[in-house]
Amino acid sequence: MTTRYKLTMAYDGHLFHGFQIQPNQRTVQGVIEEALKKMTKGKRVVVHGSGRTDAGVHAKGQVIHFDYPGKEIPAKNMMLALNALMPIDTVFFESEIVDEDFHVQYSTKGKWYRYVVDQHRFTDPFNRFYTGHYPYPLDISLMKQAAKDLIGEHDFTSFAASGGQIVDKVRTIYYVNITPDPDKKQIIFDFIGNGFLYNMVRILVGTLLEIGNKKRPVDDIPRVLKAKDRQEVRTTAPASGLYLQQVFYEDIPKKYRLDLKKD
């Protein structure tokens, strides 16, 4: 008999080779499974994640599930036990016992990704692993105008890196917001959608930065979407600025449903 646990966690991704377990690499899935192995006296417990963040990508709201063998442990105690065994660049902060038909990947209603751009002239040595550096002039109003063309259901083939195994490239973006933080000299990009393709958020950010820097026309996104060609947008923002903020398992709040307000 097993018990299915759902836990929400945060991690600093810069010393991880991504989420998914890989031979001879430090991964988020790997360190969780090592902790669980200590709790089960050597028995492997397979961990499932809501998504496979790449090397260097961070999470503030990654969700995992696993089936724990043996006696049921209260959800809070499971979280406390795992935190005691996990490295200091990870933390679990929510936990619950769920039904066997719950799956962290297939039960999702949407995801929220955030990208943080550092606008200092030179790379900040203390933030270089947590932001994407872009020291060039940016017109925020142009980026906001262009971002409206991303809202709704589109084929995002042009914004997907090669190497992904997913054939269907149609996704719906519910919400895009671009917020400057003058005090920190940062720009925050937020994207909420029903799903995202391989490197999609980083490519979207790279494209919007080109528009903000006037290297690409403000009305270019509809043309790029229609082209369905990755060669149309070659700039990919660095992994260091990307955060998985939240995974939604209930309907997306209406305040984030800009697609419903689009003409």
Curated annotation (Swiss-Prot):
Domain of life: Bacteria
UniProt-listed CDD domains: PseudoU_synth_EcTruA
GO BP of this protein: tRNA pseudouridine synthesis
Disulfide bonds: none
UniProt KW keywords: Isomerase, tRNA processing
Keyword tRNA processing applies: yes
Pfam families per the UniProt record, alphabetical: PseudoU_synth_1
Family matches, as SUPFAM superfamilies: Pseudouridine synthase
Entry annotation: catalytic residues: D54
Record-stated family: Belongs to the tRNA pseudouridine synthase TruA family.
Subunit structure: Homodimer.
Entry-linked HAMAP family: TruA (MF_00171)
Task of the protein: Formation of pseudouridine at positions 38, 39 and 40 in the anticodon stem and loop of transfer RNAs.
Protein name per its UniProtKB record: tRNA pseudouridine synthase A
Lineage: Bacteria, Bacillati, Bacillota, Bacilli, Lactobacillales
